C-alpha cells in the first residue's frame, strides 16, 4: 500500500518538474524569440524527453510467432485497463477524467504477477486528433508509455480504438469514416512498427449504430460497413512498415456481438494467417451485465455453452482464432456466485482454446457496471477470490 502511495507521490513530483521545465522553456523562448522564432507548444515541451525515450526503445524487435493460432495458444487470460485511456475527454487529463487514478507501471506489474499475461489497453483517439486527423503527440507518447508497461514485463498487449464517436456504420458515412480510420491507424502503425508479436492491434471496438433502436443488433447495411472498416484497417496495417506486415491483428463483427447472425456476417480477410476475431460476451446477461438482473448463479448457464459452440462453428472450425476481448460480471454483493460463474465461463473457453479478457473499469460499488477487480489506488485486489478462481481455472 505504501509503495502505491510512493509511486503516486513520484508521479506528482514528475508533473511539477515537467511544469517547471515548461515554464522555463517558455521564458527562454520569449527572450530568444528574435533569434529562434516561436516556441514549441507546452505539450510538446513536456513530452520531448519521454517521446525520445519511448520511440527509440522498440525500434526493431525480432518477430518469432508465425501465425495467429500460435500466438493465441500462448495466451492464458487477460485484463482490461477500462475507463482510463478510453475516457472521452481531451488532453492528458482525460486519463483520469472518469474517476480512475493515473496508470503506473506498478499497477500493470501487479496484474502480471497475479497471472494475467494479456493486457488489453482501450484507447479513445478522436478527441486527441485535429481536423487533419493528426493525433496529439503528447497523447501518443502517453499511450506508448502504458503499452511499454506491459511489453517490458513480457505481456501480450492489445491496443485498440475504443469510444470513437466519429464513426457510424452507415453507407452515407462510410467513406469519411474509412478515411479517418486509415489516417489514425497509419500513425499508430508508424509509432509502434518496431514492436514484436507481443503487441496486437485491434481495429475498432464494438462498432454499432449508437443511440438507435437496433444499436446492439444492427442490420445488413451496418454489418457491411463494419466489414469495410475491417478491410481498411487490415490494408493499412499490412501496408505500413517495420514488423506490421507480419503483426497479428484483430477484427470484430458488428458491435463485437456474439450473436451467430453478426458473427457469420463478419468477412475475415482471406489468405492472412495473422488475423484474430474479437468477441465481447458478458454471460449470462441477466447475471453478468444487467445491473437490475439476478444476483444468483448456481450451475453452468446454457448461454455460455452456446457462445462457444457458435464460436467454434463460425470461426474455430475454419482455423480462425478468437479472443473474448471483454467478459466479466458486475458486483452485486454476490462474490460466491461470481466465482462459480467465472469458473464455468473460463473452463468452457479453455476447452475451445479461447483466451478471455476481464473488463475492469475500476469501479466496485454503486449503481453502475461495477466490474472492478484491481484496487488501483492502494494496490491489492477488491475480490481476490475471483482472481484466484480465474487463475485456478486457466492453469488447471
Regions found by a protein language model. Give the residues of each.
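Active-site region of glycoside hydrolase catalytic domains
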Residues: 179-293, 307-330, 351-352
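Bacterial signal peptide processing site
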Residues: 37-39
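Substrate-binding cleft of secreted/luminal carbohydrate-active enzymes
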Residues: 305-382
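N-terminal carbohydrate-binding accessory modules
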Residues: 51-118
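C-terminal motif of bacterial Sec signal peptides marking the signal peptidase cleavage site
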Residues: 31-35
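An active-site-proximal structural segment forming one wall of the substrate-binding cleft
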Residues: 61, 99-119, 129, 133-162, ...
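Short, Lys/Arg-enriched N-terminal segments with co-localized hydrophobic residues
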Residues: 1-13
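Acidic/histidine-rich helix-loop elements
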Residues: 81-103, 130-135, 173, 286-304, ...
Amino acid at each position: 500500500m505504501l509503495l502505491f502511495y510512493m509511486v503516486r507521490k513520484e508521479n506528482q513530483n514528475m508533473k511539477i518538474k515537467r511544469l517547471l521545465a515548461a515554464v522555463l522553456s517558455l521564458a527562454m523562448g520569449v527572450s530568444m524569440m528574435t533569434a529562434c522564432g516561436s516556441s514549441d507548444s507546452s505539450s510538446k515541451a513536456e513530452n520531448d524527453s519521454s517521446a525520445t525515450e519511448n520511440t527509440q526503445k522498440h525500434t526493431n524487435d525480432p518477430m518469432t510467432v508465425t501465425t495467429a493460432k500460435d500466438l493465441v495458444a500462448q495466451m492464458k487470460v487477460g485484463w482490461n485497463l477500462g475507463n482510463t485511456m478510453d475516457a472521452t475527454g481531451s488532453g492528458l487529463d482525460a486519463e483520469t477524467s472518469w474517476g480512475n487514478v493515473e496508470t503506473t507501471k506498478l499497477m500493470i506489474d501487479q496484474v502480471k504477477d497475479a497471472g494475467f499475461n494479456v493486457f488489453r489497453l482501450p484507447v479513445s483517439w478522436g478527441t486527441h486528433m485535429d481536423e487533419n486527423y493528426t493525433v496529439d503527440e503528447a497523447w501518443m507518447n502517453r499511450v506508448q508509455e502504458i503499452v511499454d508497461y506491459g511489453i517490458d514485463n513480457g505481456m501480450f498487449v492489445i491496443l485498440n480504438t475504443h469510444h470513437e464517436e466519429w464513426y457510424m456504420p452507415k453507407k452515407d458515412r462510410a467513406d469519411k469514416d474509412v478515411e479517418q480510420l486509415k489516417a489514425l491507424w497509419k500513425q499508430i502503425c508508424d509509432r509502434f512498427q518496431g514492436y514484436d508479436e507481443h503487441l496486437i492491434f485491434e481495429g475498432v471496438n464494438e462498432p454499432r449504430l449508437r443511440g438507435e433502436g437496433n444499436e446492439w443488433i444492427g442490420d445488413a447495411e451496418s454489418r457491411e460497413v463494419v466489414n469495410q472498416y475491417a478491410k481498411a484497417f487490415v490494408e493499412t496495417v499490412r501496408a505500413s512498415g517495420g514488423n506490421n506486415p507480419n503483426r497479428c491483428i484483430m477484427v470484430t463483427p458488428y458491435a463485437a456481438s456474439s450473436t451467430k447472425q453478426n458473427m457469420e456476417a463478419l468477412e475475415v480477410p482471406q489468405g492472412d494467417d495473422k488475423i484474430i476475431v474479437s468477441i465481447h460476451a458478458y454471460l449470462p446477461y441477466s447475471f453478468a451485465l444487467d445491473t437490475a438482473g439476478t444476483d444468483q448463479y448456481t450451475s453452468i448457464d446454457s448461454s455460455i455453452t452456446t457462445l462457444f459452440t457458435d464460436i467454434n462453428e463460425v470461426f474455430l472450425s475454419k482455423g480462425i482464432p478468437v479472443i473474448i476481448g471483454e467478459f466479466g460480471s458486475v458486483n452485486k454483493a454476490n462474490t460466491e456466485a461470481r466465482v462459480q460463474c467465472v469458473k464455468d465461463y473460463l473452463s468452457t473457453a479453455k476447452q475451445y482454446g479461447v483466451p478471455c479478457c476481464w473488463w475492469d473499469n475500476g469501479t466496485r460499488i454503486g449503481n453502475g457496471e461495477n466490474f472492478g477487480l484491481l484496487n488501483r489506488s492502494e494496490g491489492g485486489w477488491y475480490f481476490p477470490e475471483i482472481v484466484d478462481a480465474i487463475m485456478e481455472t486457466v492453469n488447471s
